[in-house]
Regions:
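NAD(P)H-dependent oxidoreductase Rossmann-fold/reductase module
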Residues: 1-29, 99, 230-394
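Rossmann-fold scaffold of SDR-type NAD(P)-dependent oxidoreductases
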Residues: 47, 132-140, 219-224
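Gly/Ser/Thr-rich loops at beta-strand to alpha-helix junctions
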Residues: 48-55, 113-115, 140-144, 226-230
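Catalytic loop of short-chain dehydrogenase/reductase
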Residues: 154-264, 270-293
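A glycine-rich helix->loop->beta "capping" turn
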Residues: 106, 120-149
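The beta1-alpha1 cofactor-binding region of Rossmann-like NAD(H)/NADP(H)-dependent oxidoreductases
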Residues: 109-121
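Canonical Rossmann dinucleotide-binding motif of NAD(H)/NADP(H)-dependent dehydrogenases/reductases
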Residues: 35-74, 78
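Glycine-rich phosphate-binding loop and adjoining beta1-alpha1-beta2 segment
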Residues: 66-105, 111
Length: 394
């Protein structure tokens, strides 16, 4: 079939297999261009491995350090007349490229929150890999069925305490408008922590430890975002921020467990704001990202997921580097984004932005290009008018 982008709201409902493979190749090429990452991981488990930061971590581990990787994700294969999700195509492309380069790459497609998928993962690690020395936890999910209670928790992106009004942008139509987001109920706040907090990460680490599948000195990392004051009511001080506080609680608990197990470590890496499937869904944030891209590109400090993860691995995690923590014990690769001159420039632009000047004051075009790239569209060297086979498997 011929596959074209179909955007509905903040999601594209089609994905292009050849384009997704080209996007993966771009990421591989970037990591290889930076040279080997020494003293890197050997056996890596990535939970949430099919898109965004999780996928970029997987690419960096294999093509930077030659690591064997097992990716866990929840993606939909193609159906009659309908392409698969981009994460499905991404994971196939990564797996083929990694194996062609001589690296072990396996995948488990299913609900990472479930006990069954954890057991399946442990069995595969025990059979094929041996103890894991890096666990990357990078799940973004709208819901979680609790493995112990069976309760279904749904996450929401809402402020806490009071409704919040600010500017936002419809990234598809390039229209700036004001949006008011109602505040979360207590139940919504609790549910969001249950989905996006640290409990499941702890369960994964406990399961690996119980099965004796954590290497001495193992590292566990989860990803977070803090961002600037413009986004705080809906992000840092909202429901998702409360979940990230719980993730930090979990990091400390896991760190204590791993430290006692051969000097291991666990921490949160605070990453840069980027166009991802997850961030597109958050009101206010896409407008901030469009301005951020404009400012950082002008300064020559713009990074995407793969640049961020390559830098995290090469300058913080491995290569004989020492982790640099902030006052709260977090690693910061949002450091370039949060530089005062970048944030001051954004604060100056923010009040001025309208639909009419959006194209000049922000990088909305760059945002739209990056967004479509997530789904395999707009990649150089891909013929989007050609028939392509949507039904591909591992």
């Amino acid at each position: 079939m011929i596959i074209k982008p179909k955007v509905r709201g903040f999601v594209c409902v089609t994905a292009h297999p050849t384009g997704c493979a080209a996007h993966i190749q771009q990421q591989i090429d970037h990591v290889k261009s930076k040279g080997p990452i020494k003293q890197g991981p050997k056996n890596v488990l990535v939970i949430g491995a099919s898109t965004g930061y999780g996928l970029a971590s997987r690419v960096t581990a294999s093509f930077g350090s030659g690591a064997a990787t097992l990716g866990v994700f929840y993606e939909r294969p193609s159906e009659e007349g309908r392409p698969a999700t981009p994460g499905w195509y991404n994971s196939i492309a990564f797996t083929r490229a990694a194996r062609a380069a001589g690296y072990y790459a396996e995948n488990i497609n299913g609900d990472a929150f479930s006990e069954a998928i954890k057991q399946q993962t442990l069995a595969m690690i025990a059979r094929d890999m041996g103890p894991i020395d890096l666990v990357v936890y990078s799940l973004a999910s709208p819901r979680r069925t609790h493995p112990k209670t069976g309760a279904v928790h749904k996450s929401v992106l809402k402020p806490l305490g009071a409704p919040y009004t600010n500017k936002t942008v419809d990234t598809d139509k390039a229209i700036v408008s004001e949006v008011t987001i109602d505040s979360a109920t207590e139940m919504e706040a609790t549910d969001t922590v249950a989905v996006m907090g640290g409990e499941d990460w702890e369960m994964w680490i406990q399961a690996l430890a119980d099965a004796k599948l954590l290497a001495p000195g193992a590292t566990a990392v989860a990803y977070s975002y803090i961002g600037p004051v413009h986004t705080w009511p809906v992000y840092k001080d909202g429901t998702i921020g409360a979940a990230k506080v719980d993730l930090e609680r979990a990091a400390m608990a896991i760190n204590a467990k791993l430290a006692a197990h051969g000097n291991g470590r666990a921490f949160i890496s605070v990453n840069k704001a980027l166009v991802t499937q997850a961030s597109s869904a958050i009101p206010v944030v896409p407008l901030y990202i469009a301005i951020l891209y404009k400012v950082m590109k002008a300064k020559g400090t713009h990074e995407g997921c793969i640049e961020q993860m390559q830098r995290l691995f090469a300058t913080q995690l491995y290569n004989g580097s020492k982790l640099q923590f902030d006052g709260a014990g977090r690693v910061r690769v949002d450091d370039w984004e949060m530089r005062p001159e970048i944030q001051d420039a954004i604060s100056a632009i923010w009040p001025q932005v309208t639909t009419e000047n959006l194209a000049t004051l922000t990088d909305i075009a760059g945002y739209q290009t990056e967004f479509l790239k997530l789904f395999g569209f707009g990649l150089p060297g891909v013929n989007y008018d050609a028939e392509v086979e949507p039904h591909i498997t591992f």
